[in-house]
Amino acid sequence: QLQGYEFDKIFPGCRIIDIHEYLLEKGITLPSGQGGFLYHEPCHNPMKLGDSMKTVKSLIGDNVVKSERCCGESGTLGVTRPDVSTQVRFRKEEEIRKGEATLRASGTVAADANVKILTSCPSCLQGLNRYEGDLQNGLLEADYIVIEMAKQILGENWMPEYVQRANQGG
């Protein structure tokens, strides 16, 4: 959508790029072997320059299983039409369970460990958080790809440390 605004005419030399593609350009990736993840591709995927699974695997490693189907949130669908959203959610839950089984069978996620599902959409993140207690072995943890990367690269306290540095001017 932003491509239609022709920002380069207002700001010559500027370009619009997704954060995931920017991180790849800068060579910021997770070291290989950092565990397994489910990936939920949003209906409105911000990754426009290439195959999103290729981008995700380049960022966080090859141990990623794509979790198909809509999360059921679809903007405000979960709130405005819970009857429809619940049916969509049921199908997504089946996909999450399949992905969980694949990750556990491959050994990338231990039998008693939580499964992480990553996305890049705020609405989807809200929807995916609704599945938190639905797995049989452990919980489903939903987060953004870039947040998971920040946690693994900078540590669990990356956000308060970042805020503190920003408040101090740098």
Can you say where each PLM-predicted feature lies in the sequence?
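Iron-sulfur cluster-binding electron-transfer modules in prokaryotic oxidoreductases
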Residues: 1-170
